[in-house]
Amino acid sequence: MGRFPKDFLWGGATAANQCEGAYNEGGRGLANVDVVPFGEDRFPVMFGKRKMLACDDQHYYPSHEAIDMYHHFKEDIALFAEMGFRCYRLSIAWTRILPHGDDAEPNEEGLAFYDALFDECRKYGIEPLVTICHFDAPIALIQKYGGWKDRRMVDAYVHYCDIIFRRYKDKVKYWLTFNEINMLLHMPFMGAGLLFEPGENVEQAKYQAAHHELVASARAVRLAHEIMPGCMVGCMLAAGEFYPRTCAPADVQAAAEADRDNYFFIDVQSRGTYPVWAKKRMERAGIQLRTEPDDDQTLCEGTVDFISFSYYSSRCITVDPELLEQADGNALGGATRNPYLKASAWGWAIDPIGLRITMNTLYDRYQKPLFIVENGLGAVDTVEPDGSIHDSYRIDYLRAHIEQMEKAINEDGLPLLGYTTWGPIDLVSASTGEMKKRYGFIYVDKDNAGNGTLTRSRKDSFYWYKKVIATDGEDLA
């Protein structure tokens, strides 16, 4: 097997709302994720179908404590360094900096927390990769404006960006504007703080919010380049190929349209203009975007420097209603199971070759450097009586995907900046709110009900990934 580039950014990725905890400490304000409960009410709230803008005593909220990285970050980053991380992707919690989302002055305690975190990364030679907004909308702005449906969210976001760019310009080189921006259409409350009134045109609201996020992203890219010459700002897509279930032309067409829909946001962020097909589709659907005169120029001038994406699985599309089957945990839905692939315990198809296909699709489409910022296997781990955790299934999954990455680099010639596995440490699942759906190399003693000591333990995969990084991917055994 060929080697990876010497400057390849190996590492792991987390999100503030899934790992930090301390939701009401250090001056932090309430965010949308803080009111998304665990249990049967979780999905109605995530999808904007049930209004919940405050916490109550009847629900458990996983993000409130999460894995308490707010108080454990030095221990956790030391463990990342032990594995040899060269890069750590994390997000800044908007409301830790601006508790109400648009405060005139930032919360100094929140700024100081990230100063300390970045300094800890730098101490070990770990490059931070920062997501500016990772499923994170201030509750105060949702109450005030209705989330990203309102144009005023753009200015609030850019104000937030201006603060963190100026504060961390000497500590952070790599930035992402929005996490999995395309998930706004599928999880509108999580992705954009959207709530829908009875009779409201939901598609109009979602695409209006999408336009506002796209304009905000472009303005952030432009601002970052002004404040931090030489920095790199990327977009972030929930990626994964859509395969036709059969070679029937209708299935092939359905898969092609699903792929095109999924790349809509990145088309705009990378090319600086709306694709013609998207304009026609909105026209047919009666969607009329409210825009401002300089929006086109803003989008054109604020294109991203690289394409980052998450990849967990591919999906299989058919128009045959008898073959349709909803895959558990597949938020995009509308897919049938692929008979040629095994699936995880949560119904996600395991498709390493699909990663290589996706990488080639993205590079052929955009001709920009790529960065895989999420990839991993959610699984139930067992702690043995001696405290060991044998997660060979996770090693097998990651090995197969890294092998395909190497082929994409050395055989296909693709420029790949780095690879950050999702959840290098166990954390709260964004979709289900579970802790038992574990991704990490590091086990965290906590269960779905919030019980546990929060003790950190190394799994077998910890030592395996350490070896992978040390050999630049040459030793995957």
Short names for language-model regions:
Residues E65, M69-A78, P99, G110:
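Internal amphipathic alpha-helical repeat/solenoid segments
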Residues H72-A93, G302, F306:
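Catalytic domains of carbohydrate-active enzymes, especially glycoside hydrolases
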Residues I92-P106:
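Glycine-rich, proline-tolerant flexible connector loops at the mouths of alpha/beta enzymes
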